[in-house]
Amino acid sequence: MAPWGKRLAGVRGVLLDISGVLYDSGAGGGTAIAGSVEAVARLKRSRLKVRFCTNESQKSRAELVGQLQRLGFDISEQEVTAPAPAACQILKEQGLRPYLLIHDGVRSEFDQIDTSNPNCVVIADAGESFSYQNMNNAFQVLMELEKPVLISLGKGRYYKETSGLMLDVGPYMKALEYACGIKAEVVGKPSPEFFKSALQAIGVEAHQAVMIGDDIVGDVGGAQRCGMRALQVRTGKFRPSDEHHPEVKADGYVDNLAEAVDLLLQHADK
């Protein structure tokens, strides 16, 4: 077993990233990562509290959960913390009417949101909808506002699908920030508020929790800044250089979720 496994002592709650940890998305619904279905089942049979924490913004929670269930995962919509519902809450509370630069797959999450006469922009992983025209439309909306508001569902650089690495929302968010001279409000990892909402959902304090993800910055770094421990899996978007990142060092590196669960069940809650 890993020599750092004792660092997991006292863990009562586990936050799990989805893409790159449970499965690799892609054509036909993607594929489960070896051992991950049983690993989730073992976690849920234990005394540990489990919450799924994702920046997925190409699918609604309902669609994502249905896809994972078809792959064999024990997961429900109520167990998932995702950025689109959190963004909708912000829009309602602040009376914001967004121009939506998002993927059609997540548009249903915004059905109750007024999008007439936009006074802000919401950007997500829009995939093929990241055309020049759509980016320029978002730019024009922001430039016409006295106090531009840009809300980004996560700020990831890239992620892994079965066909290879794919650009995420972050590069497009940065383009609008640069063009408009503004800073986006990030809803999703690595936002502290996003992690805190996931922890509140399972009633666990940050120092009692561990995040398991494939993103050294968004998952590991974001969780550690909130006071959590964090493990990086060598699946999904993991790159060998992540283990030598100049700013972020995971509490441990594991080959996959199954190995992480082995260590958790040996050392956690002790």
UniProtKB/Swiss-Prot annotation:
Reaction(s) the record says it catalyses: diphosphate + H2O = 2 phosphate + H(+)
InterPro entries: HAD-like_sf, HAD-SF_hydro_IIA, HAD_sf, LHPP/HDHD2
Pfam families per UniProt: Hydrolase_6, Hydrolase_like
A GO CC term attached to the entry: cytosol
MF-aspect GO terms: inorganic diphosphate phosphatase activity; metal ion binding; phosphatase activity; protein homodimerization activity
E.C. number: 3.1.3.-, 3.6.1.1
Family of this protein: Belongs to the HAD-like hydrolase superfamily.
Described function: Phosphatase that hydrolyzes imidodiphosphate, 3-phosphohistidine and 6-phospholysine. Has broad substrate specificity and can also hydrolyze inorganic diphosphate, but with lower efficiency.
Protein name: Phospholysine phosphohistidine inorganic pyrophosphate phosphatase
